[in-house]
From Swiss-Prot:
<comment type="similarity">
    <text>Belongs to the GcvH family.</text>
</comment>
<dbReference type="InterPro" id="IPR002930">
    <property type="entry name" value="GCV_H"/>
</dbReference>
<dbReference type="InterPro" id="IPR003016">
    <property type="entry name" value="2-oxoA_DH_lipoyl-BS"/>
</dbReference>
<comment type="subunit">
    <text>The glycine cleavage system is composed of four proteins: P, T, L and H.</text>
</comment>
<dbReference type="InterPro" id="IPR011053">
    <property type="entry name" value="Single_hybrid_motif"/>
</dbReference>
<dbReference type="InterPro" id="IPR033753">
    <property type="entry name" value="GCV_H/Fam206"/>
</dbReference>
<feature type="modified residue" description="N6-lipoyllysine">
    <location>
        <position position="60"/>
    </location>
</feature>
<dbReference type="GO" id="GO:0005829">
    <property type="term" value="C:cytosol"/>
</dbReference>
<keyword id="KW-0450">Lipoyl</keyword>
<comment type="function">
    <text>The glycine cleavage system catalyzes the degradation of glycine. The H protein shuttles the methylamine group of glycine from the P protein to the T protein.</text>
</comment>
<dbReference type="InterPro" id="IPR000089">
    <property type="entry name" value="Biotin_lipoyl"/>
</dbReference>
<dbReference type="GO" id="GO:0005960">
    <property type="term" value="C:glycine cleavage complex"/>
</dbReference>
<protein>
    <recommendedName>
        <fullName>Glycine cleavage system H protein</fullName>
    </recommendedName>
</protein>
<feature type="domain" description="Lipoyl-binding">
    <location>
        <begin position="19"/>
        <end position="101"/>
    </location>
</feature>
<dbReference type="Pfam" id="PF01597">
    <property type="entry name" value="GCV_H"/>
</dbReference>
<dbReference type="GO" id="GO:0019464">
    <property type="term" value="P:glycine decarboxylation via glycine cleavage system"/>
</dbReference>
<dbReference type="InterPro" id="IPR017453">
    <property type="entry name" value="GCV_H_sub"/>
</dbReference>
Length: 124
């Protein structure tokens, strides 16, 4: 069973066991516009919660993607190199950025669940 949590910077992490899949929300991709490039971290890189994990460039701007939790990068979505627009087409599915092995699952406690994230969007 997986759980999904969200940050106020519009990243999501979908956790199964000790591994989390990280990407940006549909709201984030809609604000960015057409994604033209994604810079992903190296596999094995240690990420710190709130630290830069990736960069996404759109026709409007370049934006940092922050790690929702601390941990080690165990996989990246290499398909985004050839098809960065996948982020726009399926942000919560095939448009994921990286997978991280969680250093401390308790860090998830500070993130929002789906209902909390939807409430947060209403304040924007």
């Amino acid at each position: 069973m997986s759980i999904t949590r969200y940050t106020k910077d519009h990243e999501y992490i979908r956790v199964e066991g000790e591994t989390g899949t990280v990407g940006i929300t549909d709201y984030a991709q809609s604000q960015l516009g057409d994604v033209v490039f994604v810079e992903l971290p190296a596999i094995g890189k240690a990420l710190t919660k709130g630290g830069e994990a990736a960069v996404v460039e759109s026709v409007k701007a370049a934006s940092e993607i922050y790690a929702p939790v601390s941990g080690e990068v165990v996989a990246v979505n290499e398909a985004l190199a050839e098809a960065p627009g996948t982020v726009n087409e399926d942000a919560a599915g095939k448009g994921w950025f990286l997978q991280i092995k969680l250093a401390d699952a308790k860090e998830l406690d500070g993130l929002m669940d789906e209902a909390g994230y939807q409430d947060f969007l209403k304040t924007l």
